[in-house]
Amino acid sequence: MYDYIKGTVTTITPEYIVVEAGQIGYQIITGNPFSFQRLEGTEAQVFLYQHVREDNISLFGFQTTEERYLFKKLLSVSGIGPKSALAIIASGDVVPLISAIESEDDVYLTKFPSVGKKTARQIILDLKGKLADVVASEIVYVAPENDMVAGLSPQLEEAVLALEALGYSTRELKKVIPKLAKEEDLTSDAYIKLALQLMTK
C-alpha cells in the first residue's frame, strides 16, 4: 500500500498525470489533472490511494490528505465507485460538499456526475455526522462579532465556528453549546462529532 509519491510531474492529460520517481513513471488518476499544471517539470508530493481489482491496479492521486480521506469515505457508500468518488471531489473544495451532506441537501449532491437522487440520499445516510475530521482541518476560522462563543475554550470555539460555517443556525448551536461546555478537555473534532450527534437526535 502506498501513502504518497514524491517525484517530478512529467505528463498531464485530461484523465491522469505521470510522476517520475526512481526512473519509473507512475500513472496517477486525479480528479482534475490540470490542477497540477503549475507543478509540471518540478518535484511534487502526491497522496495516493491504490485500488486493486482482478484485472487492474490503479493509483488515484490527491493534493491533500483531506481529499483522500473524503474519497475513501465516499467509497464506503453503496453505489459509489472510485471514478464517481473522484468526480465528486474534483472541485477541490470539500467544505460545500460536507455542508450539503450535513444539511441533507440532496439537490446539491445530484449535480455531480453519476449521482442521482437515490445515491445522494445514500451518501447522506452513510456519511452525515462522520466527516468532522475533514471539517476541522479544512474550514478557515474567523473571529465572530457576536458573543455566542464568548467564554468558551479554544477547542469548543473552533468547533462552534466550524459548525456555523457548515450552515447550522445560531439557534441550533445555542441549544447544544451548554451541553458541549460540560464536556471538558475534548478536541475540536470531538466537540464537532458530539454536537452533530446532539443535533440529529
Swiss-Prot record:
GO annotation, cellular component aspect: cytoplasm; Holliday junction helicase complex; Holliday junction resolvase complex
Chain segments carrying region Domain II: 64-142
Chief site of localization: cytoplasm
Residue ranges of the region described as Domain I: 1-63
Keywords per UniProt: Cytoplasm, DNA damage, DNA recombination, DNA repair, DNA-binding
Region (Domain III): 153-201
Keyword flag Mitochondrion: no
Region spans: Flexible linker: 143-153
GO MF annotations in UniProt: ATP binding; four-way junction DNA binding; four-way junction helicase activity
Compartment(s) where it occurs, according to its Swiss-Prot or TrEMBL record: Cytoplasm
GO biological process, one term: DNA recombination
Signal peptide: none
Protein purpose: The RuvA-RuvB-RuvC complex processes Holliday junction (HJ) DNA during genetic recombination and DNA repair, while the RuvA-RuvB complex plays an important role in the rescue of blocked DNA replication forks via replication fork reversal (RFR). RuvA specifically binds to HJ cruciform DNA, conferring on it an open structure. The RuvB hexamer acts as an ATP-dependent pump, pulling dsDNA into and through the RuvAB complex. HJ branch migration allows RuvC to scan DNA until it finds its consensus sequence, where it cleaves and resolves the cruciform DNA.
Domain-related comment: Has three domains with a flexible linker between the domains II and III and assumes an 'L' shape. Domain III is highly mobile and contacts RuvB.
Family the UniProt entry places it in: Belongs to the RuvA family.
Subunit structure: Homotetramer. Forms an RuvA(8)-RuvB(12)-Holliday junction (HJ) complex. HJ DNA is sandwiched between 2 RuvA tetramers; dsDNA enters through RuvA and exits via RuvB. An RuvB hexamer assembles on each DNA strand where it exits the tetramer. Each RuvB hexamer is contacted by two RuvA subunits (via domain III) on 2 adjacent RuvB subunits; this complex drives branch migration. In the full resolvosome a probable DNA-RuvA(4)-RuvB(12)-RuvC(2) complex forms which resolves the HJ.
The protein, known as: Holliday junction branch migration complex subunit RuvA
Organism field: Listeria monocytogenes serotype 4a (strain HCC23)
Lineage: Bacteria, Bacillati, Bacillota, Bacilli, Bacillales
